[in-house]
A protein has these predicted regions:
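Beta-strand-rich recognition/accessory modules
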Residues: 4-5, 167-277, 300-301
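Conserved, mostly hydrophobic/aromatic
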Residues: 8, 107, 236, 310, ...
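Polysaccharide-binding surfaces and accessory modules of carbohydrate-active proteins
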Residues: 9, 29-55, 63, 69-79, ...
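Active-site-proximal substrate-binding groove within the catalytic cores of carbohydrate-active enzymes
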Residues: 15, 237-242, 430-433, 468-644, ...
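Short, hydrophobic/aromatic-enriched beta-strand segments in well-ordered soluble domains
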Residues: 72-76, 91-95, 107-109, 225, ...
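An acidic-aromatic substrate-binding cleft motif
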Residues: 248-327
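A structural motif
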Residues: 315, 440-442, 559
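Aromatic- and carboxylate-enriched substrate-binding clefts and catalytic-loop regions
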Residues: 319-544, 549, 573
């Protein structure tokens, strides 16, 4: 066996490249039976996703470059059914010994077959046991949104069995697309006092899948951690995949955050320069002037009154949707002031009145949807939209209904999604930016372009050419152009967080797990890795039972409040209970404003927490003082020791402890 070592972790492979082994010094970690370290999936347009496993290859051999670098060569690839593909592949594996040692892996693909190589899962960590023989103690830290925690993934992933539509008899998969579900391109597992990390280590930005899997029902235990790259390599094409990194270190998820964050800062991440007024944003009311179904919720003249109602809750920002004539979620991408709502001058006057009260206003446009019932689609949009693997347009169907039941059941609106890097689309977004700022808005907000719908685009006429997964680079190009055009002192916002896009926006309207609360949400994964960004929470729509939990969750992590009464149909004045809850937390945050608004989210102070008590932490601008934020999600009060402080927190309440 040929063995590479990186810290405690070892990877071994036989000369013929059929057998591999994972091990770790002093730990029970070992590979599963007939383990793979990569899998590929071929496609001849008739047979889809023909699996190719590393353990079944017959044309492989290992070349030892030096003690830290091997190349695994395959002259041909062989499918599960014995079909041979005239596809050569060369997998580079390098042991990287640094602060966090690990293995860097990537592949060179040279395809001469009629079948296309759609997907390559590399690296693949295919285990029978990790670092604890009690498998149920393992915890997966997934990049689900801003991050979440999955206890006992060996059992939990079984719940992803599709029962019908997928080949669960071969593997049960839990898939997280990047971007969209994933805000960052890494994840890992806490196991036996160590953190097993897998992440991208490359400057390229492509659609990617981060995946965990377990064995089919009735089979021996197996847990797989991998990432799928999507080369879509056709016959006659040669390409190199992105580099990825595997590492095992003593400690917890913070080692993964360090590995990814350190690489990003050294290679592609520059923190955005955010205006102070954005940092000082307490939250906003998000309202819709003209609804999806044509009703008028607010005229332009109503906007100052709506803002004043938000002020009573401590909110200092108004996010305005549906301000154009065509109706919200209709007519995209055409935006014109609505004369019935007050016309261009009325909109400009309303914004000025809010600003005179000390408020800020953002105007919405959608960054990627094209309404197929428009002249724009018929004349241009059909050329700019993303195309699927069969040559069809991706379609998105909205079912926003009014008081009836038919539209909410059957829908009425269809969209295609723009391939964001097409020059005409970028030019159009710049026109929209100029339009929004022409009314005096403080911010131009672009919905969805931050991550939504990361579908590969198979239109080779677009700038990504014959690399469908590289359509994601178009998002970066588009937002980079928008950001560069933004006047000084104003701001660009978008919906959903993706790490590579953070340098080109000033705030994120949260729409993933993290800003959206659920029991296992753990947004500290993103917030610690890239702490500079301003984020809002999501789904505070009314004073429903449990809304206090959403607000307390947002509070401890520093999310600004996104309050959208009745989903933008009214203002907060109709909800005095919600007004009081928001105001209470805004006032508490104000007592520690230097931490919340101008500090840095960190995770340095370990505190022993009772069950259902959650924690955040902020470092003051002086780099010394710390604020510990706590939320007691129990039905009874709890007492917690934080450093030398003892704090008692009432049931369902949030509290702060300042450490000097």
């Amino acid at each position: 066996m040929n063995t590479l070592r990186a810290g405690k972790l070892q990877f071994s492979i036989s000369d013929d490249a059929k057998e591999i082994a994972w091990s770790a010094d002093g730990l029970p970690l070992r590979e599963s039976r007939s383990a793979d370290f990569w899998r590929a999936y071929m496609d001849d347009n008739y047979r889809r996703e023909m699996r190719v496993r590393s353990c079944l290859q017959t044309y492989g051999h290992v070349e030892v470059i030096d003690a830290d670098h091997i190349v695994v060569h395959y002259d041909k690839l062989v499918g599960d059914d014995g079909r041979e593909f005239d596809t050569a592949m060369h997998v580079h594996i390098t042991a990287n010994v640094s602060t966090y040692p690990g293995f860097e892996m990537y592949a060179e693909i040279d395809n001469h077959d009629d079948a296309r190589l759609n997907e390559l899962q590399l690296p693949m960590i295919d285990l029978d046991t990790a670092c604890d023989t009690a498998r149920e103690k393992d915890v997966m830290y997934r990049m689900n949104g801003y991050g979440d925690i999955q206890p006992n993934p060996w059992a939990a992933i079984k719940n992803n069995h599709t029962e019908y539509i997928s080949a669960d008899d071969k593997q049960i998969w839990c898939v997280m697309p990047y971007p969209a579900n994933c805000s960052m391109a890494w994840f890992g597992m806490q196991t036996g006092g160590h953190f097993l990390y897998l992440g991208k280590q490359d400057t390229r930005y492509e659609t990617q899948l981060f995946t965990t899997g377990v064995s089919p029902r009735g089979c021996d235990p197996q847990l797989v951690m991998t990432t799928s790259q999507l080369p879509y390599a056709k016959g006659g094409e040669t390409l190199t995949t992105m580099r990825c990194f595997v590492s095992l270190n003593e400690g917890d998820w913070r080692t993964g955050s360090d590995i990814y964050g350190n690489y990003a800062r050294a290679n592609w991440y520059t923190p955005p320069t955010i205006p102070d007024w954005v940092k000082d944003m307490t939250g906003w009311q998000r309202i819709i002037c003209r609804s999806q179904y044509g009703d008028v919720n607010f005229t332009y003249a109503d906007l100052p009154r709506a803002y004043r109602e938000g002020q009573k809750a401590g909110l200092n920002f108004l996010m305005v949707f549906g301000w154009w004539r065509g109706r919200f979620d209709n007519g995209y991408p055409v935006y014109e002031p609505d004369d019935e709502l007050g016309g261009a001058d009325g909109l400009r006057a309303a914004i000025k009145e809010i600003q005179d009260m000390g408020g800020r206003v953002a105007l919405y446009t959608n960054g990627q949807l094209i309404d197929v019932a428009t002249d724009f689609y018929r004349e241009k949009g059909h050329r700019l939209c993303r195309i699927d693997i069969d040559g069809n347009e991706y379609r998105d169907h909205y079912r926003f209904g009014n008081a009836g039941t038919s539209i909410r059941t059957f829908g009425y609106k269809s969209f295609v999604t723009a391939c964001a890097g097409t020059p005409e689309w970028i030019d159009l977004q710049l026109e929209h930016e100029d339009l929004k700022f022409s009314f005096g808005a403080d911010s131009a907000f672009y919905d969805q372009i931050g991550a939504f719908a990361p579908m590969p685009c198979f239109c080779e006429d677009h700038p990504h050419g014959n690399r469908p997964a590289q359509q994601e680079e178009g998002r970066r190009s588009c937002l980079k152009a928008i950001h560069a055009r933004c006047p000084e002192g104003r701001a660009i916002g978008t919906e959903m967080a993706t790490d590579v896009l953070l340098p080109y926006v000033h705030y994120i309207h949260g729409a993933q797990i993290g800003p959206i609360f659920y029991e296992n949400a753990f947004p500290a994964m993103l917030l610690r890795t890239f702490p500079e960004m301003v984020h809002t929470d999501r789904f505070v729509h009314d004073d429903k039972p449990g809304v206090e939990r959403l607000l307390n969750h947002a509070f401890i992590y520093g999310f600004r409040f996104d309050v959208s009464p009745w989903r933008g149909r009214t203002d907060i004045s109709s909800m005095p209970l919600l007004t009081g809850l928001v105001k209470k937390l805004v006032d508490l945050r104000e007592q520690y404003r230097e931490f919340f608004y101008h500090g840095t989210f960190v995770c340095d102070t370990d505190v022993e927490l009772p069950a259902k008590v959650r924690k955040g932490e902020f470092l003051a601008p002086d780099g010394v003082r710390r604020l510990i934020t706590l939320w007691n999600d129990n039905p009874t009060e709890v007492t917690i020791c934080v450093g030398e402080e003892s704090v008692t927190i009432a049931a369902g309440e949030a509290a702060c402890v300042c450490l000097n």
